[in-house]
Amino acid sequence: MIPDVSQALAWLEKHPQALKGIQRGLERETLRVNADGTLATTGHPEALGSALTHKWITTDFAEALLEFITPVDGDIEHMLTFMRDLHRYTARNMGDERMWPLSMPCYIAEGQDIELAQYGTSNTGRFKTLYREGLKNRYGALMQTISGVHYNFSLPMAFWQAKCGDISGADAKEKISAGYFRVIRNYYRFGWVIPYLFGASPAICSSFLQGKPTSLPFEKTECGMYYLPYATSLRLSDLGYTNKSQSNLGITFNDLYEYVAGLKQAIKTPSEEYAKIGIEKDGKRLQINSNVLQIENELYAPIRPKRVTRSGESPSDALLRGGIEYIEVRSLDINPFSPIGVDEQQVRFLDLFMVWCALADAPEMSSSELACTRVNWNRVILEGRKPGLTLGIGCETAQFPLPQVGKDLFRDLKRVAQTLDSINGGEAYQKVCDELVACFDNPDLTFSARILRSMIDTGIGGTGKAFAEAYRNLLREEPLEILREEDFVAEREASERRQQEMEAADTEPFAVWLEKHA
């Protein structure tokens, strides 16, 4: 089932320097909660400055949903320490609140209890909140409070030049974009390995279902927790953040211009379902527009091609201008065993897997084959640890045992690890391979199995509160290592100044401005 990558691996072993200079970044979301686990109703902590313009700490859907962002970094340890500093400072500046350590929320009785993220009075800030109003009215607020980790990854120019020859200008844009689309196609085919190893949401609180019927065969504990005994990541299931109305868009990952055209079409395609919501009611705007996507960011995807945007530029226009610059991996649950929601083992594994995805042959995929890859993902998400579980290839009927496929993949990853260790020194990547490959013979070692044992003992709420309390105490005590207190104060002040400048620069009323941007 795993493609033959032997020639590409032999090439890599002859060109180890092609991997020198991998760049990466992390984003981590987490809900602010009270000591009893209920959602915090306070505004964004003052010490964190403006959520609209802060470089490192912002908010996602809700005012209580923090998002931490590291700068691009070539050093894993430095990046994780930077992320930890953001958590340390925040833990000391959020009063008696804690950071919820799980992907799935708990103790939220009603969607109405969730305040949307607020970004001030600038047109840009109001637009961001209106977008969230649209998300709430389309999908429900509760679903939007699910948290995850995003891992951003780019290969060095040396890799592309070694692989594609001496490239520059338009030629580089085309070839590098084609290379990243290969990564994406392989990710759709084999990325289920991420929830298998690191999925950490095998259960949900009963309140999350809000009384809605479900066809999933949940088991229920006395304290009202619903779980699937072999599930890995309910966050990635249809209960989590997926968008059924997007499944017919037919967006593919074979060609830059085709992909962008599909995305642009989706933000112009009217939706009968969303038209029923209405655009405005009693003088209050309910969504930006009633199209399938309000804006491009609404496209749900487990992985995205990205380029840093310029001021006023849409994500797709940035891609058209310069091609794909990096990849955003979006399938990581919060790691409940780490105070910062992600750890070194995961980052090193993702490095290995992304390099493998760049090397392995990846035939073009039609939208129907893309839909077929979802079958493997769903199996792993809902019953990944089930004995005897098999996986298929695309829309074909042949089936292969998951443990065997996993071990075959890791045989390749071990060779990538040896190459990365040869240029970085030590054996850190090979150690990660040895630790993780054991999960295929012993699924009890996976994150989902480990966290489910705790949840069955103490419930999701009990587990979440215990981890949140322990991490709060730990982070509040730890000294900053990279950033200093004055760096945070300076960024707070600078972010507030930037927001004020944006508000002062607006010349049009929001309604007029919105007509041009909706």
Swiss-Prot record:
- Has keyword Nucleotide-binding? yes
Record keyword Ion transport present: no
Q: Which GO biological process entries does UniProt record here?
A: cellular response to arsenic-containing substance; cellular response to mercury ion; glutathione biosynthetic process; hyperosmotic response
Enumerate the Pfam families for this protein: Glu_cys_ligase
Q: Name one GO cellular component term.
A: cytosol
What pathway is this protein said to act in by its record? Sulfur metabolism; glutathione biosynthesis; glutathione from L-cysteine and L-glutamate: step 1/2
GO MF terms here are: ATP binding; glutamate-cysteine ligase activity; metal ion binding
What SUPFAM superfamilies does the annotation carry?
Glutamine synthetase/guanido kinase (SSF55931)
- According to its UniProt record, the EC number is 6.3.2.2
Q: Which reaction does it catalyse?
A: L-cysteine + L-glutamate + ATP = gamma-L-glutamyl-L-cysteine + ADP + phosphate + H(+)
The highest taxon in the source lineage is: Bacteria
UniProt keyword terms in alphabetical order: ATP-binding, Glutathione biosynthesis, Ligase, Nucleotide-binding
Enzyme class, one word? ligase
InterPro entries membership: Gln_synth/guanido_kin_cat_dom, Glu_cys_ligase, Glut_cys_ligase
Matches recorded under HAMAP family: Glu_cys_ligase
PANTHER family linked to this entry? GLUTAMATE--CYSTEINE LIGASE (PTHR38761:SF1)
Q: Which family would the database say this protein is a member of?
A: Belongs to the glutamate--cysteine ligase type 1 family. Type 1 subfamily.
Tell me the NCBIfam families matching this sequence. glu_cys_ligase
Q: What is this protein called?
A: Glutamate--cysteine ligase
Organism listed in the record: Escherichia coli (strain K12)
